[in-house]
């Protein structure tokens, strides 16, 4: 992956760091804005050609269950 073209930070301890422009950080509480309810903590991120900024969210109601969502589908929980 070309890290210079997609805003990804440099490799840290053999793992990718969050993008420098990330909307959410690891551990942030978020929920889906609409549709089926999902609320939890950000545990990772991903990027694809169609989703340049997406997050893996572990459910607060069902620990261990993780769903991935594009940034536009999520909002921060106070």
Curated annotation (Swiss-Prot):
Role: Key enzyme in folate metabolism. Catalyzes an essential reaction for de novo glycine and purine synthesis, and for DNA precursor synthesis.
Keywords, alphabetical: Antibiotic resistance, Methotrexate resistance, NADP, One-carbon metabolism, Oxidoreductase, Plasmid, Trimethoprim resistance
Domain notes: The active site is situated at the inner surface of a pore formed by the four subunits.
Enzyme class: oxidoreductase
Leftover remarks: Type II plasmid-specified enzyme is practically insensitive to trimethoprim and methotrexate.
Subunit structure: Homotetramer.
Catalytic activity line of the entry: (6S)-5,6,7,8-tetrahydrofolate + NADP(+) = 7,8-dihydrofolate + NADPH + H(+)
Residues involved in NADP(+) binding: 32, 66-69
Organism name: Escherichia coli
One of the GO biological process terms: response to xenobiotic stimulus
Residues noted as binding substrate in the record, renumbered to the chain: 68
Gene Ontology molecular function terms on file: dihydrofolate reductase activity
One Pfam family from the record: DHFR_2
Name of the featured protein: Dihydrofolate reductase type 2
Pathways involved: Cofactor biosynthesis; tetrahydrofolate biosynthesis; 5,6,7,8-tetrahydrofolate from 7,8-dihydrofolate: step 1/1
E.C. no: 1.5.1.3
């Amino acid at each position: 992956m070309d890290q210079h073209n997609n805003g990804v930070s440099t490799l840290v301890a053999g793992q990718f760091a969050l993008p420098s422009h990330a909307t959410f950080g690891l551990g942030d509480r978020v929920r889906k804005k609409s549709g089926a309810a999902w609320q939890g903590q950000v545990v990772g991120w991903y990027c694809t050609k169609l989703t340049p900024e997406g997050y893996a969210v572990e459910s607060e109601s069902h620990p261990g269950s993780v769903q991935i969502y594009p940034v536009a589908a999520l909002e921060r929980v106070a």
